[in-house]
Design a protein with these regions (language model features):
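Trp/Phe/Arg-rich N-terminal binding region typifying the photolyase-homology
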Residues: 1-175
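Glycine/tryptophan-enriched, flexible segments
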Residues: 12, 146-148, 153-325
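Charge-dense, low-complexity intrinsically disordered segments
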Residues: 22, 61, 65, 213-220, ...
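Short, glycine/acidic-rich beta->alpha junctions
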Residues: 27-31, 119-120, 247-248, 279, ...
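Alpha-helical packing segments of well-folded alpha/beta enzyme cores
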Residues: 31, 70, 74, 222-229, ...
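Contiguous, well-ordered alpha-helical segments that form the cores/surfaces of helical PPI scaffolds
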Residues: 32-37, 250-254, 265, 346-349
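Extended low-complexity intrinsically disordered regions
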Residues: 328-330
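Helix-hairpin-helix/helix-loop-helix acidic hairpins
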Residues: 332-349
């Protein structure tokens, strides 16, 4: 957990607020559990806020349908746990202003949010003063070993692996699901749209990519996918994962991406599986070491969005070969439409 400002907890506050972003689940969520623990100590109710961008950049109907299916389930499970859930459609490129308005409505004693490795210190500072004098804490709930503990950018799996392995025993434990002492009472003055697939109609989304009906969003679907993977495919993971014609991978990526299942839940289930050790270890290498290497890169490399972030030798190589003759040249549309000479590329598309 990171304290983002120096404000004291407001004794006049009426609740604790958890601003959900990357960790979109009601179970096995370290940030949510931290918020519950704080609410219980303060003897206050807990409410979760989620901001939906009306004009999300680079998002389409498939992404948002999957995400909203998960949010609908999350909202239901939170209510079952006597925790409030408020969603707001937010104009502009950020939900910060809408969240500030929400905080003015509910007057929190404390705000807890998901850690975001892409959010630079300057952005955290701006957010921390949106709703003074409320303290702001962030919790790294999307990885197993908190990314802040690694302190600097790691350049390869071989450098980050021993650092993660040294801390795994400390952090790879069941998250648990506490009970709240003071239930949230709905207030009709606090507006929140119903969270369902129909909500996508109120957002400006790219409709050229239809929902993937074979993938349904939500923690229940994620847990079912995890059980199927362990039962049917984990034992062939090493031999089959790099063959696109063999269904050997976990199919958990979209659920991990939207935080609908946590890496703790997956890793503990894989550890306890009856599959061969080499298959279990290979999967955990990808899901823990390689995934957290990517998070480390985004957290500590300020130029992670551009080619300027790559190593100098790689940039030199690209420049040296920029004018090399190519046997085939394709437009972006041809590549996307699988109109190339390469059957493997075409099959992947």
């Amino acid at each position: 957990m990171v304290v983002r400002n120096g404000e004291a907890i407001d004794p006049r506050g009426r609740c604790v607020v958890y601003r959900m972003r990357r960790t979109q689940r009601a179970l096995d969520n370290p940030a949510l559990e931290t918020a519950i623990a704080a609410a219980n100590v303060l003897e206050q109710p807990l409410v979760v806020f989620f901001g939906l961008l009306a004009n999300p950049p680079m998002a389409n109907l498939r992404h948002y349908t999957f995400m909203i299916e998960g949010l609908a389930e999350t909202a239901q499970k939170l209510v079952q746990r006597r925790i409030g859930f408020v969603a707001r459609i937010c104009a502009g490129a950020s939900s910060d202003r809408e969240f500030a308005r929400f905080c003015a409505e509910v007057r929190p004693a404390l705000v807890i949010c998901d850690e975001d490795p892409a959010r630079r210190d300057a952005k955290w500072t701006r957010e921390a003063v949106l709703y003074p004098p409320t303290p702001l804490w962030s919790v790294d709930a999307d990885v197993i070993v908190p990314s802040k503990l690694l302190e600097k950018e790691q350049f390869a799996a071989r450098t980050i692996r021993p650092r993660i392995q040294r801390r795994l025993e400390e952090f790879l434990k069941p998250v648990g699901n506490r009970s709240v002492r003071v239930p949230w009472k709905d207030d009709r003055r606090i507006k929140s749209p119903s969270v369902s697939r129909e909500l996508t109609e109120q957002l400006h989304l790219d409709g050229s990519v239809n929902p993937a009906n074979e993938f349904r969003g939500g923690t229940d679907a994620a847990l079912s996918a995890l059980r199927r993977f362990i039962r049917d495919r984990l034992g062939n993971y090493v031999s089959g994962r790099n063959h696109p014609d063999i269904e050997a991978t976990s199919q958990l990526s979209p659920y991990l991406h939207f935080g609908q299942i946590g890496p703790h839940t997956v890793a503990l289930a894989i550890h306890g599986a009856a599959a061969p050790a080499r298959d279990r270890e290979a999967f955990l290498e990808e899901m823990i070491v390689r995934r957290e290497l990517a998070v480390n890169f985004v957290r500590y490399n300020p130029r992670f969005r551009t080619l300027a972030s790559i190593e100098p030798w790689a940039r030199r190589t690209l420049a040296e070969h920029a004018r090399d003759a190519r046997s085939h040249l394709y437009t972006e549309k041809q590549l996307a439409n699988a109109e190339t000479h390469d059957p493997l590329w075409n099959a992947a598309q």
